[in-house]
From Swiss-Prot:
Protein name (database record): Siroheme decarboxylase NirDL subunit
The keyword Lyase belongs to this UniProt entry's keyword annotation: yes
Disulfide bonds: none
Originating organism: Paracoccus denitrificans (strain Pd 1222)
Catalytic reaction list: siroheme + 2 H(+) = 12,18-didecarboxysiroheme + 2 CO2
Pfam family, one: NirdL-like_HTH
EC number(s) given by UniProt: 4.1.1.111
């Protein structure tokens, strides 16, 4: 994989804030000092080379659909078998093998909570293993991005979504954005045709959903491992409910912490409510970020566990609507 300066500036500058106008790639080209056709050609190449996943959006969990982070305790000889069974469930969009007793972690998504519960029941039936389900309680930072130029950066703190902005037809639009825009000069025309909506309406709704923080990011969604971010550590922290908000707010501001949120505990099975993700280019870099986090006054002496990913089985956009139309 070889990327030049323009590739790096394209990927670094547009992982969020895609220009929401009829010719977004032309607007990107103007900022980059090149042409629209060149931007589109590069995005096609970067997608085909496995560096870019899509040009689209990431959606806030549990707004237009339902989701949970879940885990299984899988005996080592059955890892490949169980991972295949979990991956066969349509709503599973992320699946990783991690260090620890609960070792196969996955994100399950569905159009609603009832469908999500049914999905987890099917996984339990197929695998013969109990599912640990840890739904999101609150997000401190879910604006995942990967700086390619300059030092590590602190991610912006999350703000609550305005769910009143959601409209009945937005689910299909969000599902389409999770799959990605067509790499053509006027992608919102193509998207609108698929959804039987006008270009202007599509752009207006994307802008409204982004401003409402229902869409947490609109831009170039990269495949971080292909860009050298090979270390993926999930760090969990055990602390009382009353301390979670202050600790989570501080933790989310540490450069190198790429996601931070609180999840529901399960008595007797899981008592680690605060989660953060550290994506790094090396194990040593990840541990440096963790050291900075542990030095925070809110987290000093707080018990924690660091669970590195050892294999990635699946990573794709979320399932929001049963039919994107």
């Amino acid at each position: 994989m070889t990327m030049d300066d323009l590739d790096l500036r394209l990927l670094d500058g547009f992982q969020r804030d895609l220009p929401l106008e009829p010719r977004p790639f032309a607007a990107m080209a103007t900022r980059l000092g090149t042409g629209e056709a060149e931007v589109i050609a590069r995005l096609v190449r970067l997608r085909d080379e496995g560096i870019v996943s899509r040009i689209g959006a990431t959606c806030r969990p549990n707004t237009a659909g339902a989701s949970t982070l879940a885990a299984l305790r899988v005996p080592a000889p059955r890892v490949d078998e169980i991972a295949a069974l979990v991956g066969a469930e349509p709503g599973v969009n992320h699946s990783y093998l991690r260090e620890g007793d609960w070792n196969l972690w996955f994100v399950a998504t569905a159009p609603d909570t009832a469908a999500l519960a049914e999905s987890l029941v099917r996984i339990e039936a197929a695998t013969g293993l109990a599912v640990l389900s840890l739904p999101l309680v609150r997000a401190f930072n879910i604006d995942l991005g990967f700086p390619l130029i300059g030092p590590r950066r602190a991610m912006a703190l999350d703000r609550p979504a305005d769910l009143d902005a959601l409209r009945p037809r937005d689910k299909a639009l969000m599902q389409a954005l999770s799959s990605g825009l067509a790499l053509v000069p006027r992608p919102f025309v193509a998207l609108g045709q698929a959804l039987h909506r006008s270009e202007a309406e599509v752009i207006s709704r994307i802008r409204a959903l982004a401003e409402a923080r229902i869409l947490t990011r609109v831009g170039v969604i990269v495949k971080h491992r292909a860009l050298g971010w090979t270390q993926n550590a999930m760090v969990v922290w055990r602390l009382p409910e009353a301390a979670v908000e202050a600790a989570g707010t501080a933790l989310a501001g540490v450069p190198g912490v790429t996601l931070c949120y609180q999840r529901r505990c399960v008595p007797g099975l899981w008592d680690w409510p605060l989660f953060c993700m550290i994506h790094a280019r090396s194990h040593a870099e990840a541990m440096e970020v963790l050291a900075e986090a542990r030095a925070l006054p809110e987290l000093q002496e707080v018990p924690h566990r660091i669970l590195f990913s050892t294999r990635c089985f699946r990573q794709r956009g979320a399932t929001i609507a049963e039919v994107a139309a």
